[in-house]
Amino acid sequence: ADATEVRAPIDIAVTSLLATVQAALPDLRSKKGAVLVTNGGLGLLDSKVDAGAVQWKASGLALANAAKAKLVRLLNKQLEADGVFVGEVVVLGAVKGTAWDDGSSKLEASSIAARFWQLYNERRELSVHIG
């Protein structure tokens, strides 16, 4: 990956997430809120995932997803004393009916929504995988 391939995904996935959380902090703290993040499987530390990211020329996205996962954990640790929960749902695969669906996707958007709802209500696990 070269720097130009990495910069935009990092700005979108990491920098914008951090800026958004910072802007919402007063409300998050006062309401004991939650930040729920969608992430993708390309950020997983796995040699097969790495090979796929290289093959699909998605190294920037893979790096951004890995960095976003770390940011979720750091933010949760920083904000837990204030009663704010930060967690992520990692989607492993294409979602049925989306542009990425080649007709073989079985992952339903409603299943992802249910995982988010569970994550929000339980506030136990920082990262859950679906797909």
Predicted regions and their residues:
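Hydrophobic positions on the long internal alpha-helix
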Residues: S16, T20-A24
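Glycine/small-residue-rich loop that forms an oxyanion/phosphate-binding "nest" at active or ligand-binding sites
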Residues: A1
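Short glycine-enriched, charge-decorated loop/helix-capping segments at active-site entrances
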Residues: T4, K57-A58, D101-K106
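C-terminal helical subdomain
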Residues: A66-G131
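Catalytic loop of short-chain dehydrogenase/reductase
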Residues: E5-D11, A19, R29, A34-R73, ...
